[in-house]
Amino acid sequence: MPVDQRPLAIAVMGPTASGKTALALEAAERWNGEIVSVDSALVYRGLEIGAAKPDAPMRAAVPHHLLDLRDPWQVYSAAEFATDARLAIAQIVARGKLPILAGGTGLYFRALLEGLSHLPEADQTVRASIAAEAQQIGWAGLHAQLARVDPVAAARIHATDPQRIQRALEVYRISGRPISAWQALPPGPRLPVRVLKVVLAPRERAVLHARIAHRLDAMLAQDFLGEVQRLRALPQMQAVAAPLDLPAVRAVGYRQAWQYLDGAGGLAEFRDKAIQATRQLAKRQLTWLRGELDARWFDPERDRHQLEDAIVGFLADRPAVRQASGV
């Protein structure tokens, strides 16, 4: 049997607050790696505390990629991510380093590892027209429009998901073909690397819930609300007619903080809503991860040795991936 000569990469996956960042840093330091963020919140400048973005010492210790690519009033698509990530991975491999893909955005992982259908490129004029319509009839009204021209896509997209509604209508108006028909086409080429997928997930849901609450409280102690207030004060953000529809503001925690600062309820209510929203995100992430049949699952506290053995075994047949000195 021929030897698989593709470069190796490790994908550190899992629900929010499961310890992905710590594992990615540890693995990068031990196995001479660089980290490629697979997180839709970390691409936005100004989202620091609430997004648990790696801080300056972490970035100094290990090179990080795909952070701070866009301003918070801008949009960044999964297709753009896949293109940028492929380039970053190729450059890491060319340096003789190990790419470590770390994050919890399932759509980004799918776009990168499996490829996306070749959808029409974004048209800012069409997007602006759709956004203007949303101001008149609301996103629910636009969702109803989508249901008439593309019932398959409308059934998959919630009426409160403006980004996906806008994209589906944009594709239809540009091409005359429903986005569901485009998505049924064969995807583009897969990533030309061999990937070990490791999922960090506590076995008991209560443990994950406790980690989520603890992390939110730590973020509040670091002045998360002040961070959101500073985002709100940016002139470009104030110029946005519906900031809650922006992908950056829709990031978990930020939306609830924005609404609280708008005067919707007290601090305790904000905390409860943010925790509940984060739990719901974790549940969706776990549901998606269960579909990754080639992934290996580990409890971040109980399975440290098994996790290490899995990575060592995966890397064993590639001596070109060098360990950092002294490890």
Curated annotation (Swiss-Prot):
ATP binds at residues 14-21. It is an enzyme of class 2 (transferase). InterPro entries: Dimethylallyltransferase (IPR039657), IPT (IPR018022), P-loop_NTPase (IPR027417). The record marks 105, 127 as: Interaction with substrate tRNA. Its cofactor is Mg(2+). Its EC number is 2.5.1.75. GO terms for biological process: tRNA modification. It catalyses: adenosine(37) in tRNA + dimethylallyl diphosphate = N(6)-dimethylallyladenosine(37) in tRNA + diphosphate. Gene3D superfamilies: 1.10.20.140, P-loop containing nucleotide triphosphate hydrolases (3.40.50.300). HAMAP family: IPP_trans. Belongs to the IPP transferase family. This is tRNA dimethylallyltransferase. It comes from Xanthomonas euvesicatoria pv. vesicatoria (strain 85-10). The gene is miaA.
